[in-house]
Amino acid sequence: QNRVIDMLAKNVLDELVKAGFKGYNDENKSGDIRHILIRRGYHTGEIMIVIVVNNKNLLSNFRMRSVVNNLVEKNDNIKNIFLNLNSSNTNEILGKEVKQVYGMEKYITDYIGDFKYFISPKSFFQVNTQQAEVLYSTLKEGLKLKDNDVLFDLYSGVGSIGIFLSK
């Protein structure tokens, strides 16, 4: 786990608690905050925060605006912050509705090899970019693909394996 992310997660949690938000209780379906997602571009250092809330009213809540302002004030590398609504009785992390509450871009960027990826709040992307690069390089060496070979990269999120192997 990355120390920057650990510190930022604590900071986010502290700000939410200070603003009076309660953690979600799955047993009685009560509380405000279901999850906190923090993504950090390994090569770029760009940070995205996604706060998953249980109530639509929290998408435009004054206390939440205060939390966002305090986080941005204390952390220079935050590129964007999103609120995600998940009020469904489900074990899925993210809901369908996403609202951007800070930043101009709707994504952060990172690289695997020579390829640049644009990572949005709901994108599936490798969590450990450094290890993914090692794994993909090992895979490329083992496959020994030729220029006219065809590779299918099915059910693969953004397709980072196929993209890496295409060069």
Predicted regions and their residues:
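Accessory RNA-recognition modules of RNA-modification enzymes
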Residues: Q1-K167
